[in-house]
Regions:
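Conserved subregion of the PPM/PP2C metallophosphatase catalytic domain
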Residues: 1, 6-160
């Protein structure tokens, strides 16, 4: 799960903390169901953008539901595929929540990030980086694609 509270400063932090608390309290279920759970329970905040992803290793897919300007990408064998995040603000205005499934292959990277990163990054500019630890991929994206005047969050995970 990745979230970004709407706005800046303490009010945005309240929204982000509420998302984290509700995510921890949510029943283990599909990404869509978890996102619906969070949406209903953070209405007292100014809202957030939220992405929830779940690996299904048996089916070799990732299930994903996202609302707002969260960038979500699967990188497999050098090919980048965007995952769909629908418009809206969790806790306030959404037209619906949908869950999508995306195929994964061995060594696929799943990258989620907030709008604090420019989404025009290209892992091909860093030969061999995709084979390194996910934390190094995340740190490199944060360093080189981070917007200096915005907070940023990055989540990178790898399949095996």
């Amino acid at each position: 799960m990745l979230c970004d509270g709407l706005g800046h400063g303490p009010i945005a932090a309240v929204a982000a903390r509420a998302v984290l608390a509700e995510f921890a309290a949510a029943p283990a279920d599909s990404p869509k169901a978890v996102l619906e759970f969070i949406h209903e329970r953070i209405r007292h905040t100014r809202g957030a953008v939220v992405a929830v992803a779940e690996f299904d290793p048996g089916a070799d897919v990732i299930r994903y539901a996202g609302i707002g300007n969260v960038t979500a990408t699967v990188v497999t064998a050098g090919q980048r595929r965007a995952m769909v995040s629908l418009p809206g603000i969790v806790g306030h205005h959404i037209s619906g929540i949908r869950e999508f499934s995306y195929p994964l292959g061995p060594g696929a990277l799943v990258i989620l990030h907030s709008d604090g990163l420019n989404d025009r990054w290209d892992l091909d500019e860093y030969p061999g980086l995709a084979e390194h630890a996910p934390v190094l991929v995340a740190a490199t994206l944060l360093r080189d694609a981070g917007r200096r005047r915005d907070d940023a969050s990055v989540l990178v995970a790898r399949t095996w």
